[in-house]
Swiss-Prot record, chain B:
This is Cytochrome b6. Its cofactor is heme b; heme c. Pfam families: Cytochrome_B. It is found in: Cell membrane. GO terms for cellular component: plasma membrane. Component of the cytochrome bc complex which donates electrons to the photosynthetic reaction center. The chain crosses the membrane at residues 30-50, 88-108, 114-134, 184-204. The gene is petB.
């Protein structure tokens, strides 16, 4: 486990690399904002419920579970438990080993969960919900 | 520097400590930049959010019109709003990717369990900021997304009914919902987020960046 640690100084090597990446990020943001600006949509109408309502992409996985599970309480509890499990990761996986290849079960379970979330997001993005 | 040192003894040591702090070379890797970029996205949100707050009016009657004004009339308003929109989306994507990096490199393991926990809170806070901010333009989608959010919270056992009333400002959706989401979005959640960010960074400094695998 004892490895030689190669270090670089914070000034100026690390800080300039960080600054370069930060500038690229800000550039990408401006390009996105310029090419795909946020447009106005219709104002809120309390009397008309829109058909086929979908949340933003980061909530889609949970929304699909909510819509798919017939029992509403279970539909909330399942995403809740999934997020709760995330908080508990360091206590669910206690081994000292860090290389993914040496902890196949934990990495397998975690990867499977992430793939489920990704698949649900894809599913939610492609299907028509409700209506 | 001498001028400062005379007035603030010890400041030279602090500056030296920051400048000469050695960083492990394996962190010069794009996967190790994701956390820093998430912070940058958050800072962009603070700055653009401040400008949007100058013109935004958090009442059901005026909200949509004020966002319309920001988009169509205010100088650079459309740009600032688009930047706020994209930085919000990228922040969530980045916080998620940062979590994947920390998980797969096993960096959350002893002694860094508490920092993983702080990171989880920051993920949930990011989602909360996105959820509360989504209502503010008071568009059809934003209004009904919040209604569904309140309904969903309402079907929780024990706390559900109270949570729904607290979110809606009444048994039914009231005008209070917008002010509550506004206060959450611009005051409470950002302050809590900054608190967790500070804890996150202090822990990194105390524990050091994890060794290469």
């Amino acid at each position: 486990m004892e490895k030689k640690r190669f270090t670089i100084p914070f000034m100026p090597v690390h800080i300039t690399t960080e600054a370069a990446i930060a500038m690229i990020f800000i550039g990408v943001l401006f390009i996105l904002a310029g090419v795909l600006p946020k447009e106005m949509m219709e104002p809120a109408d309390k009397l008309v419920t829109p058909i086929g309502l979908k949340p933003e992409w980061y909530y889609l996985w949970a929304y699909v579970i909510l819509e798919m599970v017939p029992n509403k309480l279970m539909g909330i509890l399942i995403p809740g438990v999934m997020v709760g499990a995330l908080f508990a990761v360091p206590w669910l996986e206690r081994s000292k080993e860090r290389r993914p290849a040496k902890r196949p079960i934990a990495v397998g379970v975690f990867t499977a969960m992430m793939l489920v979330v990704a698949a649900l997001t894809y599913y939610g993005a492609t299907i028509q919900i409700g209506g | 520097m001498n001028w400062l040192e005379e007035r603030l003894p010890g400041i030279g040591k602090v500056a030296e400590d920051i400048a000469e702090h050695p960083v492990p070379s394996h962190t010069l890797n794009i996967f190790y930049c994701l956390g820093g970029l998430t912070l940058l996205a958050f800072l962009v949100q603070c700055v653009t959010g401040l400008f949007l707050a100058l013109y935004y009016k958090p009442t059901p009657e005026a909200a949509f019109a004020s966002v319309q004004m920001i988009t169509n009339e205010v100088r650079f308003g459309a740009t600032i709003r688009s930047l706020h929109h994209w930085a919000a989306n990228l922040m969530i994507l980045l916080v998620f990717l940062h979590m994947l990096r920390v998980y797969y490199t096993g960096s959350f393991k002893k002694p860094r369990e508490l920092n993983w926990l702080a990171g989880c809170f920051l993920l949930v806070l990011s989602l909360g900021l996105a959820f509360t901010g989504y209502l503010l333009p008071y568009e059809q989608l934003s209004y009904w997304a919040s209604v569904i959010g309140a309904e969903t919270a309402g079907s929780l056992p024990v706390v559900g009914a109270t949570m729904k009333i607290m979110m809606q400002g009444g048994i039914k959706v009231t005008a209070e919902m917008l002010s509550r989401f506004y206060v959450l979005h611009v005051m409470i959640l950002p302050l809590v987020t900054i608190g967790f960010l500070v804890a996150h960074f202090i822990m990194i400094r105390v524990q050091g960046i994890s060794d290469p695998m």
